[in-house]
């Protein structure tokens, strides 16, 4: 399969990209100028890197063109780590939410049949002891990153 991956240079994303490539898939991955692509250098014969980010609708269309699936794990943020995000909440939400919607729409227009959106454990800053940690567990994020 040809799979578009956003966030491939991130913590989870590079593991996902490695696993998809080891299963024989061809990948089209977004990168920003500041991205560290070195952990995926060994996969260069299976990975096509394309410049792009969540704020650019045309790069979303280019990324998903010809793909069978999308794995979306990208995040726009400022600050040194995702948990110490210093960006304005409005800018953070607009860029990530609208960027994700642009990516979904680009995938729909391109006829992509599968779209996987990766969340984060940061939605569960507080975990209740009396129930399992599953999709019914209440969400209590403390940062923009874990927020809705």
PLM segments and residue spans:
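N-terminal Rossmann NAD(P)H-binding glycine-rich loop of SDR-like oxidoreductase domains
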Residues: 3-23
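Conserved Rossmann-fold NAD(P)-dependent oxidoreductase catalytic core, especially the SDR/UDP-sugar
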Residues: 72, 98-144
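Conserved glycine-rich Rossmann-like NAD(P)H-binding loop of the short-chain dehydrogenase/reductase
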Residues: 25-35
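Conserved hydrophobic beta-strands of the Rossmann-like cofactor-binding core
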Residues: 3-5, 70, 115
């Amino acid at each position: 399969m040809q799979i578009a991956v956003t966030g491939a240079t991130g913590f989870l994303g590079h593991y996902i990209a490695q696993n998809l490539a080891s299963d024989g898939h061809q990948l089209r991955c977004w990168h920003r100028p500041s991205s560290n692509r070195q952990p995926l250098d060994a996969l260069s014969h299976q990975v096509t890197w394309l410049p792009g980010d969540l704020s650019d609708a045309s790069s979303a269309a280019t990324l998903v063109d010809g793909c069978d699936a999308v794995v979306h794990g990208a995040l726009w943020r400022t600050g040194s780590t995702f948990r110490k995000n210093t960006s304005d909440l409005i800018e953070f939400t607009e860029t990530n939410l609208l960027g994700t919607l642009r990516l979904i729409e680009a995938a729909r227009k391109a006829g992509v049949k599968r779209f996987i959106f990766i969340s984060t454990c940061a939605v569960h800053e507080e975990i209740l002891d009396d129930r399992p940690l599953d999709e019914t567990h209440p969400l209590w994020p403390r940062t923009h990153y874990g927020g809705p």
